[in-house]
Regions:
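Gram-negative outer-membrane beta-barrel domains
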Residues: 14, 96-105, 180-184, 188-193, ...
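C-terminal hydrophobic structural anchor segments
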Residues: 145-193
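Internal alpha/beta core interface subdomains
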Residues: 4-30
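Detector for outer-membrane/organellar transmembrane beta-barrel domains
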Residues: 21-24, 28-165
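Outer-membrane beta-barrel "beta-signal"
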Residues: 17-27, 185, 211-224
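Outer-membrane beta-barrel translocator/channel fold
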Residues: 54-56, 195-218
């Protein structure tokens, strides 16, 4: 990846990516694909199925969006980095006020052989150590919602993240799962939203202790 200024040294190489989306039942009503709820109330089932892939040639950021967060070396003591691959697939379904949105993401690393965490042959990278530098693993997110004709909206969501090496203490990606349940009311042509949202999250802390969090929030949102 490239530095942002002349003093910001480049680390690694280029990042490549692409995405494809198909609409087996035709397109959604105008603008309805870009909001969660089926405000336009599709008269027939509309589906978008998508897949994306990216390849970061020499990653030095946990998610491949920056550079220089860590340094690695080859056996000669020169800078060298692993490659980061990310694959995701998703599906969006809308019909008569109902919405289903689900996505899956998998991130892996390659070219890990003969990498070192310091410019010394005594510090060869161990398999689990890479998870302290790169966010590697799998994630699933599923959301469902329904909106009535008079603006009442209901939704639930579940997400799960599983690191490639779940028991590494300083893993860049931590095991967690969460549930959300919400109810909302839209006013003034859907420009004002009043929402009550409940959440339960279970995850592991830095010291690998399980932690549970519960919350209830009320939100007021004005859309322009």
């Amino acid at each position: 990846s490239f530095g942002s200024t002349s003093a910001d040294v480049d680390c690694g190489g280029l990042k490549y990516g692409g995405r494809v989306t198909i609409y087996p039942n035709g397109y959604f009503k105008r603008g309805n694909e870009y909001v969660f709820y089926d405000f336009a109330r599709e008269t027939s089932p509309k589906v978008a199925i998508g897949a994306a892939f990216s390849y970061n040639d020499g990653a030095s950021n946990a998610v491949g969006e920056g550079h220089g967060d860590f340094r690695m070396y080859d056996k000669e003591g020169k800078l060298a980095y692993p490659d980061l691959r990310k694959f995701s697939a998703d599906i969006l379904l809308k019909w008569a006020g109902f919405t289903l949105l689900a996505d899956y993401t998998n991130t892996t690393a390659t070219k890990l052989q003969n990498l070192y965490t310091a410019a010394s042959v005594a510090s060869k990278l161990q398999p689990e150590e890479i998870s302290q530098m790169l966010a590697l693993g799998n994630g699933v997110d599923v959301q469902m919602g329904y909106i009535t004709k008079n603006g009442w909206a209901f939704n639930t969501a579940y997400s799960y993240v599983k690191p490639e090496f779940a028991e590494v203490e300083n893993s860049a990606l931590r095991k967690n799962y969460a549930w959300d349940v919400g109810v909302a009311k839209y006013f003034c042509g859907n420009t004002l939203k009043l929402q009550l949202l409940g959440n339960y999250t279970h995850y592991r802390t830095v010291i690998m202790e399980p932690y549970k969090e519960r919350s209830v929030k009320m939100n007021i949102q004005l859309l322009f």
